[in-house]
Design a protein with these regions (language model features):
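Glycine-rich, highly charged phosphate/nucleotide-binding loops
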Residues: 63-72
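Donor/substrate-binding cores of folate-linked one-carbon enzymes
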Residues: 3-4, 24-25, 35, 84-203, ...
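Internal anion-binding site segments
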Residues: 198-315
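N-terminal beta-loop-helix "entrance" segment that forms/cooperates
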Residues: 38-58
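Short amphipathic alpha-helix with an adjacent loop that forms part of the alpha/beta core around
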Residues: 71-81
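N-terminal Rossmann-like dinucleotide-binding module
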Residues: 1-42
Length: 315
């Protein structure tokens, strides 16, 4: 297989796994594009992206443009003379960037497109209770996550796993798919497929304070899916009505019961060294949680410190 000259674009840890896989393949990484450094925390400490750290450690040419439409940046990209751009978890690219390479610009998306277009496909696959997801490579065009599909790889979702666990599986699966996709592009041995569009398609919007809050009017199964879909980050949350403090919940087991307890939904029961939260169709057995201002703790640690939460309501 001939070497493809690649410019890689990405920012988080998910992208690092893919970049590492590409470096150890037969291709040549000519440059890495990642997000500018940012100040974070109370001390405004400068944070570098995971991709930047990797590029520096591996002595790869690095660019951190603030404005992707900047003429100087565009010219520098053109001078690299790459065959293809590879994008994994990066910003939306302007046409002046993605149209540069001869073989196009491809993106890796952590879902089976056209399902779950958007910023958080791994989280929403679990939140929606899907039994299957996967990864997709596609050509970037004007609309986000709408380009022609090149390849896909499917993966079963365990009914008990959380987003953190699925993330690791998809990172590995995505790395392999990228190498496979580059191989068929290099040989020109593929036929890309136009994406379908339908009102029935699930979407994967950016996570925020509203869509991560637990609604205790929902079924126990849907709350269970929300909690594991948001674990370990950013976490599903609720509020204790008495103290008005936020309670983050990371791990639960759902127990379905026939007798409806709709009027008790969201009530905490601490009994026999267990924490239960009532739902209208059963209860959630809480294994790991975090009260506002406190550390993340096991259910036993919580019981030892907060027995007064027995029979309190969450909202």
């Amino acid at each position: 297989m001939n070497k493809l000259k690649i410019v890689f674009m990405g920012t988080p840890d998910f992208a690092v796994g893919c970049l590492d896989f590409l470096i150890n393949s037969n291709h040549e990484i000519k440059a890495v594009i990642t997000a500018p450094d940012r100040a974070a925390g109370r001390g405004k400490k400068i944070i570098q992206s995971e991709v930047k750290k990797y590029a520096i450690n591996n002595s790869i040419k690095l660019l951190q443009p603030i404005n992707l439409k900047n003429e100087k940046f565009i010219n520098e990209l053109k001078l690299i003379n790459a065959d293809i751009f590879v994008v994994v978890a990066f910003r939306m690219l302007p046409k002046t960037v993605w149209e540069i390479p001869e073989k196009g610009t491809i993106n890796l998306h952590a879902s089976l497109l056209p399902q779950l277009r958007g910023a958080a496909p791994i989280h929403w696959a679990i939140i929606n209770g899907l039994s299957e997801t996967g990864v997709t490579t596609f050509f970037i065009n004007e609309k986000i996550d709408f380009g022609n599909i090149i390849e896909q790889s499917k993966l079963k979702i365990n009914c008990k796993e959380n987003t953190g666990q699925l993330y690791e599986k998809l990172k590995s699966r995505g790395s392999n798919l990228l190498v496979s996709t580059l191989k068929i592009i290099e040989k020109n041995d593929f036929k890309s497929i136009k994406q379908t569009n339908s009102e029935k398609l699930l979407i994967a919007p950016k996570l925020n304070k509203n869509n991560t809050r637990i609604d205790w009017k929902n079924s126990g199964q849907s709350i269970f899916n929300l909690i594991r879909g948001l674990s370990p980050y950013p976490s599903a949350w609720t509020k204790d009505e008495k103290s008005n403090k936020i309670l983050k919940i990371f791990e639960v087991i759902f127990h379905k019961e026939k007798n409806s307890k709709e009027n008790l939904s969201g009530t905490i029961i601490i009994k026999n060294n267990t924490i239960k939260i009532i739902t209208y169709d059963g209860f959630l057995e809480v294994l790991e949680l975090q009260l506002e201002g406190k550390k993340r703790m096991s259910y036993l640690e919580f019981i030892n410190g907060y027995k007064n939460f027995h029979y309190q309501r969450l909202s």
